[in-house]
Amino acid sequence: CISTQVGCPIGCAFCATGNSGFQRNLEAYEMIGQVLGSERELQRRLKSNENGLITNVVYMGMGEPMLNYDQVIQSIYTLNDPKGINIGQRHITISTSGDVKGINRLARENLQVTLAISLHACNNELRNTLIPLNRKYPLEELIPSIQEYIRLTNRRVTFEYLLLDGINNSREDANMLI
């Protein structure tokens, strides 16, 4: 799980990162450095010199990956390079809070990465409260964008849904998910 920004401008209600404010976008080399640093730490803990211990990467740490799109894509190409870390594109996931513009760009990128959507609510009223970006890209825009991504890439999309007691975990919420 790697970060794409220092801080985050989205301000999701359930995420501590938004409380720290947004400072800057990370460069591609800083994202790659997180993967290399994690591999070094894993080697140390396993007392191993073996490379390739990191096999999957998820852009889901601090920040909204789609708001640093160009650097994220550059880092993916570097991570995927056989002369570099050589992580298969299908082992890379980009998680977004629903930036439709970024999803549409990614759909045309010809990458085999997995798209993950931080959904957390099935109606705009609650989603506006939990994920302020929903005010810019409501579900009526997000869902067609996801469908177009699937159509163009033939890739699956995963949905993330944090259960918040008394907020989005009712039977009605569950029924809206299906």
Name every feature range the model reports, one short phrase each.
Residues 1-37:
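Canonical Radical SAM [4Fe-4S] cluster-binding loop centered on the CxxxCxxC motif
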